[in-house]
């Protein structure tokens, strides 16, 4: 069984500023730093943040049924501001999913606003079809909100220092 889910989060930041975080390892670092109750640790197992990079994401205690996942960056398109990562171990794969792909896009909406579009494409074995309900964009919505809030706060602090 195949499926896909998407979520859009509008934020008051320029697309280029968001992409500077989303296109690099900084997104993973900030995710663990800003959301320790969701992600306890992110380790780079291979690569430098480009295509082919392999991350091990360890979930905080209390995430039912999942302890960690490994994801490989399979696409980074700077022109389209698009990044894709494929789960290669753990996480949803331990729940009967045969494929779990995350797509993150930063869409320009205006001079100082953009949209973070999070998409999950998955395939789950028929015998585990009931587990399709575990597919979700919620973590990426939470991460997007935390990262954009962090960047806005940083921007605000810089403005205050200039006064």
Swiss-Prot record:
The free-text tissue note of the record is: Mostly expressed in bulbs, and, to a lower extent, in roots, stems, leaves and flowers.
Which positions are catalytic residues? 83
Q: Keywords, A to Z?
A: Alkaloid metabolism, Lyase
Catalytic function, reaction form: 3,4-dihydroxybenzaldehyde + tyramine + AH2 = norbelladine + A + H2O
Q: What is its EC number?
A: 4.2.1.-
Q: Which pathway does it operate in?
A: Alkaloid biosynthesis
Q: Name one GO biological process term.
A: abscisic acid-activated signaling pathway
**GO MF annotation list:** abscisic acid binding; lyase activity; protein phosphatase inhibitor activity; signaling receptor activity
Top class in the EC scheme: lyase
Q: Does the keyword Lyase apply?
A: yes
Q: Which residues bind tyramine?
A: 68-71
Question: SMART domains, per this entry?
Answer: Bet_v_1
Q: Cellular component per GO?
A: cytoplasm; nucleus
* Statement: the UniProt record of this protein carries the keyword Cytoplasm: no
Q: What's a Pfam family in this record?
A: Bet_v_1
Q: How does activity depend on pH?
A: Optimum pH is 4.
Q: Which family does it belong to?
A: Belongs to the BetVI family.
Job description of the protein: Catalyzes the condensation of tyramine and 3,4-dihydroxybenzaldehyde (3,4-DHBA) to form norbelladine, the common precursor to all Amaryllidaceae alkaloids such as galanthamine, lycorine and haemanthamine, and including haemanthamine- and crinamine-type alkaloids, promising anticancer agents.
Q: What name appears for this protein in its UniProt entry?
A: Norbelladine synthase
Per the UniProt record, the source organism is Narcissus pseudonarcissus (Daffodil)
